[in-house]
Each structure stands twice: as C-alpha cells, then as structure tokens.
Curated annotation (Swiss-Prot):
Functional description taken from the UniProt entry: DNA-dependent RNA polymerase catalyzes the transcription of DNA into RNA using the four ribonucleoside triphosphates as substrates.
UniProt entry keywords in alphabetical sequence: Chloroplast, DNA-directed RNA polymerase, Nucleotidyltransferase, Plastid, Transcription, Transferase
Classification of source organism: Eukaryota, Viridiplantae, Streptophyta, Coleochaetophyceae, Coleochaetales
EC number: 2.7.7.6
Single annotated GO MF: ribonucleoside binding
A GO biological-process term: DNA-templated transcription
Name this polypeptide is given: DNA-directed RNA polymerase subunit beta
HAMAP family named among the record's database cross-references: RNApol_bact_RpoB
One Pfam short name: RNA_pol_Rpb2_7
CDD domains named in the record: RNA_pol_B_RPB2
Chief location: plastid
Catalytic activity: RNA(n) + a ribonucleoside 5'-triphosphate = RNA(n+1) + diphosphate
Similarity-based family: Belongs to the RNA polymerase beta chain family.
Complex and partners: In plastids the minimal PEP RNA polymerase catalytic core is composed of four subunits: alpha, beta, beta', and beta''. When a (nuclear-encoded) sigma factor is associated with the core the holoenzyme is formed, which can initiate transcription.
Length: 1070
C-alpha cells in the first residue's frame, strides 16, 4: 500500500513480517561466522595433536524436506552446518583435513516461524535493560538521599557505585556487602597517584583517604574484594588461584559490557574509548565517580529507566547465538576429552570421529522446547500469526516477573510513541508486560526500536523518511499533524501539536523539525484495523484488537464494508495468500496445484494447502482466484487463504444489526440472532482435530493394529477397514473406534485384573495376553475423517515407537453459547436463535440478523461501533466499500459524523427510502415486530456491522458428568473438562444453600455426591433397586483427611459415642 499526499511524496508500508526474517538472516551470515571464529585450537596434554577449524569455510546445506513436508512428517525443519576441520599430528607432521558435519540448525520458514518436531513455533522478542550505565537516587536506611550508578553488563550482571551523604563513594559487591570505590580501582591495576589526578574534586577524595586502613596496592585490594565477595575469614594470602577465581566470578561477569554498553558509556560519560573495548576500564569507573560527585553537588541529570533509549530488544539472533556458543563449548570439551585419551586408543582418529553432530541440534531443540519465549505459534487466523511474531515481552529469563512488576514499568511512556503500541497489550497479569510493535517500527542492529519520520526543511521538503531511535529523536520537535490541516490560511491552523523532550506541546509549524508519516504510525497492526478508532475508549479498543486475533476463519468470508485500508497489507505479509514469484502464464490449475509457464519457458509448480490443520485446530486452506491461461505478474496473488478475499483480510461478516432490547434476551452482553445465520452458513466455521495413536515396540512385543477387537460392539467398529484403520471420508461419532489396537501384556498382569481372577476361579480360564488400547473418538468430536498418516521414526531398536495420526473435520454452525464480537470491544454470547419471521424487520421488509443491547454502548464509550454500523448501512445500499483512516477530526470538526450522514443521505436519494435518514431521528428508523407486525414505540438504530465469530465456542466448553475419576487424596471429583472432572461445592456455594435452609440437599452434596466412599456405592445400589437411600453414619473422606493432617501436628481427634442408658463408650475410627 502507498500513501501519496502530494506530487513528490510517496511512502510504502514496510513488510510487517520482515523483522524476524532479517534477524535470522543476520544470524546465518554474521553470528555463525563470529562464533566459529572464536572456536580455539585444541591440543592434547603432551601437545602431540592439534585440532582446529576453518570458520571462513563453513557452509549450510539446503533442507531435503520443505516446510509443509516437515509439518506432515512431524520432523524439525533444519539445515546442516558443515565446516572444514583439521587434525594435525605434530610428532609425525601429518595433517588430516575434512569437511565435517558440525550439527543441524533449525531454519526459519518464509512466514517467520520455526518447525520443531512438526509443530510451528514462534520466538517472541524480549525487551530488557540495555547494557550500560544508569544514574539514579534512593533513600538509605536513615532516609538520607544517596546517588547511585548501576553498570549493567552484557550478561545482565550489575555493578553498583554509590555516594552517601558523607560524600564517601562505595562499590557494592553484593546486596549486603560493599567496598570503597578506591579498592575497586586499585584492584583493576590503577595507581593511587593516578586516581588522585583523575578525580575532579580532590576534597572528596581526601575525605576518603583520611579513613584508617586505606589500602594502597593492587594485591591488598584484590584480597579485600575476595574476602567481601566470598565472606572469607582470616587473612588469606595472595595467590594466582584467588586472582583467577575473582577474574572468573566477578570481573568477567560484571565488567563485560559489549559493544552496546561501550556505546552507552561513551555517550553518557563523554568518553572517547574505542568501541572494540568491550570490557569495563578504570577510566570508566573514574568518570562514573566524577559524575556521581557532580550529582551530589546538584549538577547533571538522573536516568529514566523506562525510557526506550535505556531498553533494547533481544531478538532471535541473540537467543540462537547464546545456544550456538554453549553448544560449541560442549563440542570443544568433548573434542578435548577425546584428544587427551588419544594415546589409549588403538584406532586412528579423524576430524569426523571427534565431532558429535547431535550436540548442536540438542541445544537448539532444548531452547525451542523449554524457553518461555519460544512459544506455540498462535494460528487461529492469519492476523493472529502475524501479531504473535511482532510481539515483545518484558518477561522471561533476565527480565521482569508478572508478580513483582510495578505499575510504573507497565505504563505507557512518551518514548513508546511510534515504537510500541499504546493500545494493544495482554489483559490480566501480563498487562503492559507483553506489548506489540507499532506498525511502522523497526529494530536496528543494536536492538533499539526505531520509528520513521519526515524531515521538514527548505532544501528537501519530502525526502526519504529517516528512522530514529528514542535517544535520537528526543531533541527534535516532531509534529503530529500533517500539511493538509496546516496549509489552510486560517491563523489558528498554523499551530500544530508536537512532541518534544517527552512532553506534548503546541508549536508553530515553522518550528517543527520532523513530522510523522501515517496517522496509524503509533498503533500496532491489530489496532490499525479498527475503523473510527478515535471514537472508542482505549480499554475497549484494546479488547477489539485482542478479539480480532480470536476470530475463526469462516466457511464463507466477506470483506468489511467499513475498513481502514490496512487489511490488504496485513493479509499479504501474513503469508496466508499464495503469491506468484515470477511473471508468466497459468498453464495448469486445480484444487491442489497451480503451474505457471514463466517467461524463461520453464514450468513452476506451486502447491495449494487443502484443509490443513493449524495449531489451534482451525483450517488452513487455499482458493485459487486466477484462471487458466491468465497472465500473472511477480507479486500477484494466485490464491486466497482461509481469511482473505482478493488479498484483503476478511475475518467476519457484514450483517444487519439493531440496537434495541428484546424481551430481556439481550440483557447485559447477551445477543439475539436470526436463524438465517445458521441456514445460510453465514457463521459456519471448519475445525480440524488431530487424534494421535502411539504404536509401541518393547520387550513384550509390538502393538498390533487390527480390526478384530474383542468385547467391543460391532457397531463401533463399522468404519474400520481390514487393516484396522478408519476409512477415509467416514462420518464418525463419539465412541467410534478410529484405530483398532491390541497391546501385549504379561500373563501376571492379566491376573491382576479382577475379572481375570474371577474367570480363573470359576471356569479355570485364562484371559488373553493382550489388552484393548484402541483409539476412540471422544465426546463432542463428531465429524468427517479427512486424512490418516503414519509417522515412522528413523531410529531402530527395541524402544523406537511409530505413530498414526487421524484428522477429523468438523463443520460448526453458530449456536447458543458461542461468543461473537465486533471490532470495538463489543462482545457477547448468543442467548437465543429466533426464526427470521419473528425477528424485527425494516420498512422495506428486510429482517434484522442480530439484536444487540443499546445499554452496552454509553457506559463503555465505544461509539465507533455506531459510526461503523451506520456507514456500513449506507454502503450496503450504495454498494460501496469505505476505507477510513483514524483521526479525521483534525481536518474538520465532527468530520466522522458528517461523513456518515452524507453517505446516508446519498443512499436515501438513490433508493428512494426516506426512512434511511429522517431529520428528526438521524441514524434511526422505525422497526416492525416480526411476531405482531406492529411498530415499536421508539425509533431504533439499525445498520450493517462487521461481526466476528470467536474461537470460544460452546462445543469446546460445555461439559457434563455423572460418575468419573476421583482425586486419590480427597476422594472428591477431579477438576477440569479435559480430565472428565466435576463441579466443586465450595464455601460460598454452601452459604447459598444454608441461606435457603436446604439441609438435605447440602448433606447429599457434601457426602454421597462427593467424597463419602461407601455411601456413594450404597446410593447407586438404592437407585437400582428402588429402596430408600440411607443416611451416612460415618464421616466423609475430606474430614478424615483433616483429622490425619491434625495428627501430623500431634493433635488426636476421636469420635466417641456414649449410650444414654448404660453410659458405655464406643470409639469409632475416623
């Protein structure tokens, strides 16, 4: 998409998915070489053998399987890393040089995700405190203000310097221990005379040197730090071991600041130290001390830790670089061990035999499988996928935690504008900690977020945009308006809102240095899809942007009548449509392939996705939109995805809505819908479930796939073929066997089964050596079998298992209990489905599709839905689509309202329907009751709204249980739908029943229906025989558990019955 505001200005929106791809490209081209270059030469103990690699000769091999085949076969999509290695025998002066496989590296897909064991995963970028120096202030234990300087290393370790109210300067070694800053400087090798010369205020230094026992040489300083750091008692003697230990645990961890830290220190302290000097130097400490002294004297400024100039983004390349470094260290250790033992080996070693190629992939798989920021890719729809890859998180290793993060950290900062979206974030405990990049933001090589701006000067009014980080744009006046509002000759219009030094000001246009590019430059791609965004409360806009990510792809999608113009860009960059890579002519076309005859006379074959399952069980599907013999250009869309139409994002449907109460069925957030949505498949979605069966091979034998399953009704086996697999295309229902399987078991195990002992005792029979472990369709899984696949593992041997996957497709129509939502945070649950004849209808006889509550608008302040609804209504009659950019009010007061009313007026003139725009009730019209034919008392707001069906569906939520599993400890029903659990009668539920005096119901719920073991069996027998249910005489299991826990504390509880007549005691065991 391009925006052109005059003859010379043109700006193209960036590729929204390129951040991940560029970052991984940087890893492949630069970081791998850098880490291989750091790989040392390895010698044996006698220096007879030398092993080394040639980093400049590394290369990667193209994967054998493509992305789609890797998912289908449940393997990792990866490339092989080869490097030239050399083993020299120095004694014999012989050399062996070979190209060796160093290991496998997972590859990023064209969509910016990774495929690990057949599952798509996304790596979320992490935003952390940048390495460097930060000055702050805090109160000490005596409530006196002290100034601090925190130096953050590249690994995240911290070194803290502080100046107290007595003007003494300390270096904090740990939370509780500190040493004089002079001691730290002496330990770094600088002389006391040099320190005296470098301090700008000698009087403060004299104050420190007046103290007793001031150290004066490097060895004593190192011993002092060692004693404080390791709490060493006595007076340790200086040795090389102490020096190396201190070097490893203190100086290397806390003093390696890296390139970013060095740049940060140079800028803050005004130093000219080369960027290659990545370790902390004595000059840095001296400059820090001087700055602290100035702060104590009221000179200088403190740092804002939440400013984006002090935070950097840790991306894919940084994470993978760490794993590569660790893997190479392990490879180095294994080679070292092998070479050390070389004299004991009789066989001749080669470079290939020294390297274990499995180490590298093991490290990467461990990262992708266990790291909190390597996440299961959210594939509900194509927007969700793109947003997930553009997410940035403050959580994770080295970051914040959701429980300890303060409100200050979560809040919006002025430096976020144009870089991090102020609207889209998680709800709940992650609010403000997980955010989304703004639509035009990019991440530079140093990891800082940049935003584009236009320069405003006489020489080049509309030049190429410049990308600035938060540190660089701080001293510029950035105009937030644009020239359309400024060029008018009204004096008041010459003042424009601007951003300057973290403040929002009004400034003359002539004083502005930069201006923003797009109105939606400040928002994420999710928020950029909301039309009339400026008329919505920010909380509801947040919900709207989050709920668009939960919309399920529909069977029949539709473009929104009212959009923002951003839909096509998001659809294209999400990877959902199939795009041509060449110019050519469509030679062949069907539902599986498209063949293009290129201008070079070569044939290119492109495969379409056909009803494939996503990570969220939604459908990934392609529909060809080109025709046979059609000429196509490079970049042209050949096939639409499940959520695109003609390359434009389409997540929902435009339906006729009315804002009115209807018999209480749309009370609160309930929604009334017409049966037309069901019969015309307007909200029918496709869901694909995957059922997996493992075929084990162990010492007892191999599992057998067969149709002959004993003790199962033949009705449930009706879909199996002669091999025991379900037939493709079968309609299966709950309880049907999908794969028949018998697992072998030992004879002793079969006797442990109760019926085994019974059969043996009565008939002398022995039950079989196999048990039924068939794959059965669970409740609620009814559907059509669309695919069966076998997965054979490469490893042979006794414990290698194979898998069979069965894919079942469900077509779900909208029903009561499903969740629906608009784009403005207006969500609701379907409460009633009415016949279209009973629904209210317009004056031209058209029935309303959905009735929403009018009380959901004023209190929530999302008026954008009303403007969208009315403009969509006009577009429906005018057969027009609208693309509205936000903040149109800066051009003219009431611009949005005027646009809507003018379009309604055009629709009224075109159709001749006067009720489309009535002067006394603008935007409202009279509706008729479908049941009686009479008009309602009040005119009603009617329009066409874009409504989405969300993934929160009643089929996945509804659950019922009669009997099922019980918790072993409490003997109460387990929790959760997935485990077949039950409801728990808690404290408040007991109060509710007590309030109504329902004593018997309460007793049943707390005993026979819950955890009274013997009584619940008696109840079942009483129901079957029709006898009276006896009142339990003993205590339930939860009370017995309490008694046992009290016994652990030494408190004995006894239950004693005393008979009134004889006064005899009878003790009952609890």
């Amino acid at each position: 998409m391009t925006l052109q505001t005059n003859q010379t200005e043109k700006f193209t929106l960036p590729d929204l998915g390129k951040i991940q791809l560029q970052n991984f490209y940087n890893f492949l081209t630069k970081i791998i070489y850098k880490e291989l270059k750091a790989f040392p030469k390895i010698y044996d103990s006698e220096h007879n053998f030398e092993f080394k690699i040639y980093p400049e000769e590394f290369f990667l091999v193209e994967p054998i399987l493509n992305e789609r085949e890797s998912i289908y076969k449940s393997i990792t999509y990866s490339t092989e890393l080869y490097v030239t290695a050399e083993l020299n025998c120095i004694k014999n002066q012989t050399k062996q040089k070979q190209k060796v496989l160093l290991g496998h590296i997972p590859l990023i897909t064209s969509n910016g995700s990774f495929i690990i064991n057949g599952i798509s995963r996304a790596v979320v970028s992490q935003i952390l405190r940048s390495p460097g120096i930060y000055f702050g202030s805090q109160l000490d234990s005596n409530s006196k203000c002290i100034y601090t300087a925190t130096i953050i290393s590249e690994s995240g370790s911290r070194l803290k310097l502080e100046i107290d109210d007595r003007k003494l300067i300390w270096a904090r070694i740990s939370k509780k221990r500190k040493v004089s800053a002079i001691v730290l400087l002496l330990s770094m090798g600088i002389k006391l005379s040099d320190i005296t010369r470098s301090i700008e205020h000698p009087a403060i230094l004299d104050n420190i040197l007046k103290k007793k026992n001031v150290l004066s040489n490097q060895k004593d300083a190192i011993l002092e730090i060692y004693k404080q750091l390791f709490s060493a008692g006595g007076d340790p003697n200086f040795s090389d071991n102490i020096l190396s230990e201190l070097q490893r645990t203190f100086f290397q961890q806390r003093c390696e600041i890296g390139l970013i830290g060095r740049s940060n220190l140079n800028k803050k302290l005004g130093l000219n130290i080369p960027d290659e000097e990545i370790f902390l130097l004595p000059e840095d400490i001296l400059a820090t001390i001087n700055y602290l002294i100035k702060l104590s004297l009221g000179i200088g400024s403190l740092d804002d830790i939440d400013h984006l100039k002090n935070r950097r983004v840790k991306s894919i390349s940084d994470f993978l670089s760490e794993q590569l470094k660790n893997a190479l260290n392990k490879i180095e250790n294994t080679i070292e061990q092998s070479i050390k033992n070389i004299s004991k080996r009789k066989r001749i070693l080669t470079p290939k035999s020294l390297i274990n190629s499995g180490i590298l992939l093991a490290f990467f798989k461990d990262f992708f499988g266990s790291h909190p920021l390597s996440q299961f890719l959210d594939q509900t729809n194509s927007l969700t996928e793109l947003v997930h890859k553009r997410r940035i998180s403050s959580l994770g290793p080295g970051g914040l935690t959701r429980r300890t993060a303060s409100f200050h950290v979560r809040d919006i900062h002025p430096s976020h504008y144009g870089r991090i979206c102020p609207i889209e974030t998680s709800e709940g405990m992650n609010a403000g900690l997980v955010a989304s990049l703004a639509s035009n933001a990019t991440i530079n090589t140093m990891g800082f977020i940049e935003s584009p701006f236009y320069q405003l000067n006489d020489s080049s009014l509309f030049d190429k945009p410049i990308f600035l980080s938060a540190r660089e744009d701080e001293n510029f006046r950035i105009a937030l308006g644009n020239r359309l509002a400024i060029d008018q000759e009204i004096q008041e219009k010459q003042i424009t809102p601007a951003r300057y030094k973290q403040e929002f000001i009004n400034t003359p246009w002539s004083l502005a240095n930069l201006r923003s590019i797009f109105p939606w430059q400040y928002f994420s791609i999710g928020a950029s899809l909301i039309p009339f965004l400026e008329h919505d409360d920010a909380n509801r806009a947040l919900m709207g942007s989050n709920m668009q990510r939960q919309a399920v792809p529909l069977l029949i999608t539709e473009r929104p009548i009212v959009g923002t113009g951003f839909e096509a860009n998001i659809a294209r960059d999400s990877g959902a449509p199939l795009i041509s890579n060449i110019d050519g002519k469509i030679q062949y076309l069907d539902s599986e392939f498209i063949e293009i005859l290129g201008v070079d006379k070569k044939t290119y074959k492109l495969k379409l996705s056909n009803y494939q399952r996503s990570n969220n069980n939604t459908c990934i599907h392609h529909r060809a939109i080109v025709q046979l013999n059609q000429w196509v250009r490079k970049g042209q869309i050949l096939a639409d995805g499940a959520t695109t139409i003609r390359g434009e994002l389409s997540l929902g449907r435009n339906i006729l809505v009315a804002y009115m109460p209807w018999e209480g069925y749309n009370f609160e957030d309930a929604v009334l819908i017409s049966d037309r949505l069901i019969y015309d498949d307007l909200y029918t979605s496709i869901h694909i479930q995957k059922y997996e069966l493992e075929i084990k091979i162990n010492h007892q034998g191999q599992d057998k796939i067969t149709k002959d399953i004993p003790h199962i009704d033949k009705y449930f086996l009706r879909h199996l073929d002669e091999n025991g697999l379900v037939t493709l295309g079968s309609w299966v229902e709950a309880g049907d066997v999908l794969i028949g399987k018998l697992s072998s078991q030992e004879r002793e195990d079969s006797l442990k089964v109760p019926e085994g002992k019974l059969l043996q005792a009565i008939f002398g029979l022995q039950i079989g050596n196999s048990r039924d472990t068939s794959l059965k369709l669970p409740a609620g899984g009814e559907g059509r079998v669309i695919d069966i696949q076998w997965i054979f593992q490469d490893e042979g041997g006794i414990d290698s298992n194979n898998f069979v996957n069965v894919y079942v497709l469900q077509k779900r129509r909208i029903q009561v209990g499903d969740k629906i939502a608009g784009r403005h945070g207006n969500k609701g649950i379907v409460s009633q489905i009415l016949s279209r004849h009973d629904m209210p209808y317009l004056q031209n006889g058209t029935s309303i599709d959905m009735v929403l509550s009018p009380l959901g608008v004023p209190s929530r302040m999302n008026v954008g839905q009303i403007l969208e609804c009315l403009l969509g209504f006009a577009g429906k009659f005018l057969n027009k689509n609208y693309r509205i950019t936000p903040f149109d009010e800066r051009y003219e007061r009431e611009a949005s309202r005027k646009l809507v009313l003018s379009e309604l007026h055009k629709a009224k003139k075109l159709t001749g329907y006067p009720w489309l725009l009535e002067p006394e009730n603008a935007g409202k019209s009279r509706l008729f009751d479908g049941r009686t034919g009479e008009t309602f008392n009040q005119p009603v707001t009617v329009g066409s709204a874009y409504i989405l069906k969300l993934i929160h569906q009643v089929d996945d939520k509804i659950h019922a249980r009669s009997t099922g599993p019980y918790s072993l400890v409490t003997q109460q029903p387990v929790r959760g739908r997935s485990r077949g659990g039950g409801q728990r009668v808690g404290e408040m539920e007991v109060w509710a029943l007590e309030g109504f005096g329902a004593a018997y119901i309460l007793q049943e719920m707390l005993t026979v229906k819950s955890d009274h073991i013997h009584s619940r069996y008696d109840v079942l027998g009483a129901i079957v025989t029709g006898t009276t249910i006896k009142t339990p005489t003993t205590t339930p299991e939860s009370f017995r558990l309490l008694a046992r826990e009290l016994r652990c504390l030494g408190i004995q509880i006894n239950d004693i019955e005393i008979y009134h007549e004889t006064l005899q005691k009878k003790e009952i065991e609890i």
